[in-house]
Amino acid sequence: FLAVDCSPAGDIYGDQGAIGEGTLIRFFDPGHLMLPNMKDFLLTTAEEAGIKYQYYCGKGGTDAGAAHLKNGGVPSTTIGVCARYIHSHQTLYAMDDFLQAQAFLQALVKKLDRSTVDLIKNY
């Protein structure tokens, strides 16, 4: 399961999540901890596809937190974009980050097959 979401930018305060630094790969949030093989799959795919990315550990949750509990466990992750003023009527993000996230999702879907899912689940 690939959740697509915006996460709050913390770059003004020197925290993680910088606008303009690429798509987000969320390894952890209070409702979800990524499987180690999912992490490997994401990082390998990003490197192979030349995707600009940044690590992110969120304080809020995403749909990946609910999805990974369904049907005996669904491998899940969140791919996102850093933004300011999320949950408001005026969200601000970098278009290049959005395009990197879009390209990353396309690369992931092209590589994702049954054997890859089985490998991800084998922790």
Tell what function each PLM region has.
Residues 24-102, 107-123:
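Active-site-adjacent substrate-binding region
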